[in-house]
Amino acid sequence: MSLYRSKVWCVYIVRRDDGQLYTGITSDLSRRLGEHARGVGARCLRGAKRLQLLYCSASAYDHKTAAQMEYHLKRKRGKYFKLRLIKAQPRFLHQYLSADKPLR
């Protein structure tokens, strides 16, 4: 069994000290936030002095599903959608994404 398939994954959003939002996925949130704090991983977070966790979905997704939702948030949605998501704090991100139809 693949490492990706043997774990459950979540989608999270953090804010840098300059206000920039970062969206990512992980199977271990505390480990991943520690990596970000040490400057390991995402390049855009390496210079940040302080990170604030704003949102974390339920750890209920396989790697593929979590990666698809991360892609959707990063590429298909804007900052204001993410801010609404953070305010709403839905436990299950897939339901929130499917309920909010994109504008055409």
Curated annotation (Swiss-Prot):
Domain GIY-YIG: 7-83
PROSITE patterns: GIY_YIG
Pfam families: GIY-YIG
InterPro entries according to UniProt: GIY-YIG_endonuc (IPR000305), GIY-YIG_endonuc_sf (IPR035901), UPF0213_domain (IPR050190)
Family in the record: Belongs to the UPF0213 family.
Listed PANTHER family: UPF0213 PROTEIN YHBQ
Protein name: UPF0213 protein ORF82
Native organism: Orgyia pseudotsugata multicapsid polyhedrosis virus (OpMNPV)
Higher taxonomy: Viruses, Viruses incertae sedis, Naldaviricetes, Lefavirales, Baculoviridae
